[in-house]
Amino acid sequence: MGAPDEVLNIAPDEGDKLRAKALAADAEELPAGYYTSPRVVCTFMSISLTLLSTYFAFEASAAAISFIIEDIGPSENVSLFSTVWTVSQSISILLMGRLTDRFGRRGFILGTNCVGIIGGIGCLYSFQRFNTMIGAQVLLGLAAGQPGACILFIGELMSNKTKFLGNVIVAFPNVIATGFGPYIGQSLGINGNWRWIFYIYIIITAVSTVLAFIFYHPPSFAQLHGKKISRRDELLKVDWIGAFFLTAGMTLFLLGVSWGGSPDPWDSPKILGLLISGIVSCVIFVLYECYAKIDRPIIPMEFFPGTFAGFGCMLLISGVMGSMNTALFIMYPQQVQHIFSSTLSSWQEVAWMSSTAGFGIWAGIVTLGSLFHIFRHIRWQLIFGSAWVTAFLGAMASVNRHKKSEAIAFSICTGFVIGWAEDVTMLLVQFISSDENLGVTFSVVSATRAICGSIFTAAFISLYTIKFPGQLQSKLVPAVPRRWGFPGVLLVAGFAYWRALTGQCPSYWLLFPGMTSNLIQVTNDAVADSYAAAYSYVYYFAMALGVIAIIASACTKDFDHYLTSHVPHQIYAAKDADVDLLDSDRSTENVSSAAVTVSEKE
């Protein structure tokens, strides 16, 4: 007897649609105890542990970077430490979409975990070579594609109306990374034990890998395509040319954006070369995807036209929320350091205050995510959430050295909705995607968030960098009493710029002739006020982006009718993972019902 596709005279693409229908289920029809079975529980544990280990390593190592440099030596490539991680994660997510839709998710999860462990080992053994650590960060960034896509891996296992509950379960332990990660990283750095950041990462990721290897058996290649199509045939259909142009364009452009302004000026040949070549590569990629008639495009262009109220709005909201997340997650700790460091008593107090935004983001995901499907009225939730974030970003613009309590409250309130709104867009886009294209649809929205975050990181940093010198001049000179004269102004100006560059105000400045504790206090206050004024422009900029999110939310289609019991994919026992459902005893029932659905869609 031939393969099911041959017996039923099914074309390969139509067979994929029929199998996608057969692989899906209604939550009420799943076997009793399915979600409490060891294979499902351990799958959730595996994905949750990888999420925790990845973002712990990222947050903790970023907090300990100064201690890492002090230990293994300085490098002109320090700015690449976080940049290559972000760029690599974006590329990993984009490529993950199409490849895992075609070849299955299991290999991607196991492969990225192994790549991450290798990257962690590379960080451990980067003795006296910071460039070795940069290379290891590339591997860690590629491995971070998996936790960046955990909303897909968990979402496809849950019904439409309970997807966010699955995300809440996985994200719950991540408070250790987002809330406590910077504090733990700085503490380990101060005690000379920064390598334990990567020991912890390797240990947790190894446990996650073992759990995934034993229990994680999502639809396999045979279940997705049958046994008529070989992996070699499918590999030949992959859009490798498009993948090359996309990877090259993204890498060049994001490196140019990240390096622009600091350490290199925007008009330098290096930055212009990176930006222009990156944009040209991305344009070539889009044209190639549109006109080359590829069987398996990396990003299908048909997603974009005529779907603004669905896919288009999700792209806009995801991009804006990613940018706002950047404004809060990256800029706020710097703001705390620049404005409040002279008034906070210890590094512990600085670290805890810098973590409030992370706690807010985690609390919002856990709290609002649990109520998402109960409140319904999704479009109004998006409108209210976008307006909430925009309003509190405006409140953040009012923060100065006299408003420490307000800064803590506003950062928590802003983060409370940002994390939830980011995740919502990546869940909602799964509602409007066919089950066989869940990965590629998700990857575009998720990568948009990361790309916009990188772009606006550079824009925000450039904005406050440009505004700060003028603000310092306008606030410092009037603050110096006339009786101190010109020498006092020069001394204060020198200290102010040194304080602005280093963020430190050690007592040995009192040894300079004419310098007094009053002069130091005046300088600290002027620098803090100048930074507060400069950062306010960043939040005004972010508010303008928030208006875009509000408009996109108002234009979003009604998603409430998608809150059904439909479950796209399941976790199987290992012995059932390679069974073609169209070749099973129930194939006739599956094929007949699936064929009706496919014909109705067409």
UniProtKB/Swiss-Prot annotation:
GO cellular component: a single term: plasma membrane
Top-level lineage group: Eukaryota
Principal subcellular localisation of the protein: membrane
Keywords, alphabetical: Cell membrane, Glycoprotein, Membrane, Transmembrane, Transmembrane helix, Transport
Membrane topology of this protein: Multi-pass membrane protein
Chain segments annotated as transmembrane: 49-69, 77-97, 107-127, 134-154, 164-184, 196-216, 240-260, 271-291, 297-317, 355-375, 380-400, 408-428, 450-470, 484-504, 532-552
InterPro entries registered for this protein in UniProt: MFS_Str1/Tri12-like, MFS_trans_sf
Record's subcellular location: Cell membrane
Free-text function comment from the UniProt entry: Efflux pump that provides the dual role of trichothecene export and self-protection by allowing the fungus to evade the harmful effect of its own trichothecene production.
Similarity comment: family membership: Belongs to the major facilitator superfamily.
Name the record gives this protein: Trichothecene efflux pump TRI12
Organism: Trichoderma arundinaceum
Taxonomic path: Eukaryota, Fungi, Dikarya, Ascomycota, Pezizomycotina
